[in-house]
């Protein structure tokens, strides 16, 4: 790493890109997300030595949405082993949209990767638990442990909104069930899926979760929360597929493992250096925080930390 980061540097990057929020949009297909303030933006960085840097609205809670997929992927591998998980879902990037059924129809019905919705539904079905409630409590507890925040909860309004309007996800799940890719009760699997996408986090929480993945699964005290090999797998999947059909552009412009969510969050991992959490609800036409994408591009260029 060539340059050090500080609050003034972060302020400059954020304020330089904040006007882009005017051109962003809020997602209309999840009504609960339409109440966000497009001008909000926050960033939080946790370095491996424990030092933190932050600016803006880094403590505003928002729903984690698809960023939860990296947590459930790690759990599914820890619960079942990578061989079983990747016998149900692939590792390959795709040019299709995150909620497209086309990859399932064009192949053997197995989702190409765990980051698209179909793949994440398969991964969710593999989380251990006697009931959907027990499954979700394990996911919530694990999220709290990774973020070192026992107060993380679910946004019940967002959950109900997603459950009510999630017909595309429902169609994906029933397609997967019909093809024998997933086992169990479809509605219970979707209940768990919608709930873990509705977990409330902050940019600070994301930065602390990213820290774990940057530190090969260890927390600040050295406790191994995720096996190092699992972290490596998740980072690789993030790098290839974390931004769906925008992943290639993100790799070129930003160049670190990261995952976006339509709630406006981005989690970024700089292996061996830092975890990054960002929140900016104004989205570009691919469903990524428009300010967050550009701030990360400037930040990684300044720090010279791109993995490529």
From Swiss-Prot:
Top-level class of the enzyme under EC nomenclature: hydrolase
Binding site for substrate: 66, 117, 162, 169, 193, 244, 262
EC number: 3.5.1.2
Keyword field: Hydrolase
GO biological process, one term: glutamine catabolic process
Gene Ontology MF, one: glutaminase activity
Record's catalysed reaction(s): L-glutamine + H2O = L-glutamate + NH4(+)
Gene3D superfamilies referenced in this protein's UniProt entry, alphabetically: DD-peptidase/beta-lactamase superfamily
UniProt-listed InterPro entries: Beta-lactam/transpept-like, Glutaminase
UniProt cross-references to SUPFAM superfamilies, sorted A to Z: beta-lactamase/transpeptidase-like
Subunit structure: Homotetramer.
HAMAP family: Glutaminase
Assigned protein family: Belongs to the glutaminase family.
UniProt-recorded name of the protein: Glutaminase
Gene behind this protein: glsA
